[in-house]
Design a protein with these regions (language model features):
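Short glycine-/aliphatic-rich beta-strand segments at the starts of folded cytosolic domains
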Residues: 1-8
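Conserved residues at beta->alpha junctions
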Residues: 8, 33, 60, 64
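Amphipathic alpha-helical interaction surfaces in cytosolic regulatory modules
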Residues: 12-26, 36-52, 66-71
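Short polybasic amphipathic segments
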Residues: 28-31
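C-terminal structural segments of small proteins and small subunits
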Residues: 53-82
């Protein structure tokens, strides 16, 4: 299981994120914020937990050596501020 913190701060970012996840429809993916977990393929689910101040934990059952999805979600990785 792959897990990564992601940052989705707006409606347009949520739409872009779901566009990416729907390209991988056969892979189970979820987003979790606090006690709430939703299907990462669902725009309604993603919008229901989007909070500009909090990161979500993205999980996916990725096949080994599958890097395409990881590359696609790079724009949503939180930036580290010094």
């Amino acid at each position: 299981m792959f897990a990564q913190s992601v940052k989705i701060s707006s409606f347009s970012e949520a739409m872009k994120f779901v566009d990416i996840t729907t390209k991988y429809d056969g892979i189970s993916m979820h987003l979790k914020v606090d006690d709430y977990e939703v299907d990462a393929h669902s725009i309604v689910g993603v919008l229901s937990i989007v909070d500009g101040d909090k990161n979500a934990v993205f999980t996916a059952n990725l096949p080994e050596n599958d890097t395409a999805l990881l590359n696609d979600i790079k724009p949503f990785l939180p930036t580290v501020q010094a």
